[in-house]
Curated annotation (Swiss-Prot):
Keywords: Cell inner membrane, Cell membrane, Membrane, Transmembrane, Transmembrane helix. It is found in: Cell inner membrane. The lineage of its organism: Bacteria, Pseudomonadati, Pseudomonadota, Gammaproteobacteria, Pasteurellales. Pfam families: Virul_fac_BrkB. This is UPF0761 membrane protein Asuc_0342. GO terms for cellular component: plasma membrane. It comes from Actinobacillus succinogenes (strain ATCC 55618 / DSM 22257 / CCUG 43843 / 130Z). InterPro entries: UPF0761_bac, Virul_fac_BrkB. The chain crosses the membrane at residues 36-56, 93-113, 131-151, 173-193, 205-225, 237-257. It is a multi-pass membrane protein.
Amino acid sequence: MKTAFTPFASFGKIFLQRFGQNKLLLEAGALTYSTMLAIVPLIMVIFSIFSAFPIFNDVTGVLKEFIFTNFAPSASDVVGQYIDQFVQNSKKMSAVGIISLIVVALMLINSIDNSLNGIWRTPKRGTLFSFAVYWTILTLGPIIMGVSIAISTYVTNLSLFRGELNLPFGIKLLGFVPFILTWLSFTLIYAIVPNKKINIKHAAAGALVAAVFFTLGKKAFMWYITTFPSYQLIYGAMATLPLMLLWLQLSWLFILLGAQLAAVLDEIQLEQNNEIHSEQVNNKDKK
């Protein structure tokens, strides 16, 4: 007997099945490892692209703060100093070394591509086409990110949002800008990366859930390590590394959960369309 909760129960059942089948916890761990290897090459490429566009000079500092805060919300200053040092060292590398760093950055994009296509159960792209897609993401991604942050910075500086016009809701609106940017970023990832046409509504729904978990998770993570700083007693000066690993693991898990939610919505819609088509065929046969 069907009730109002039957669709939700069916969705939950399929979601849990796919969560186990796709081994999202293991996938999140693999992406965390790939991110740790590729974070310096990726940031180096991003800032190199930014340096080619003078319009982004004023945004670079904001972008650094954005990246470091999201990669390691508990120790963004320390992580930022180390990564700045690594990036400075990378400028002394030869052409072969720079190419190797770019390859490592492309490998991270490949890992993300494989994980998301595995969730949607889509076939792999051809090698040349995959390289073209990855290179486009690596080159255009930072530009899109820079434009988004530039717009966010511009909006922040508007008198309306600074509250200079005595509009109290301005500050509240301003607080949603990072969340909206995160939501839009996840939506684009879910809509573009899988090797199939994705329903944009489903991608946005999954991205919304991922953005909520990501935002709340970051706040909860910062609260925990501030309230219970026992990790510093255990790891001492090395405390930044395990914290960064833990947050990266959680971040990728949130992103994969949102992707899985969008994929299940696509799967359910496909099943419903097939049922409707079957009913239409049966009705025609009866006539």
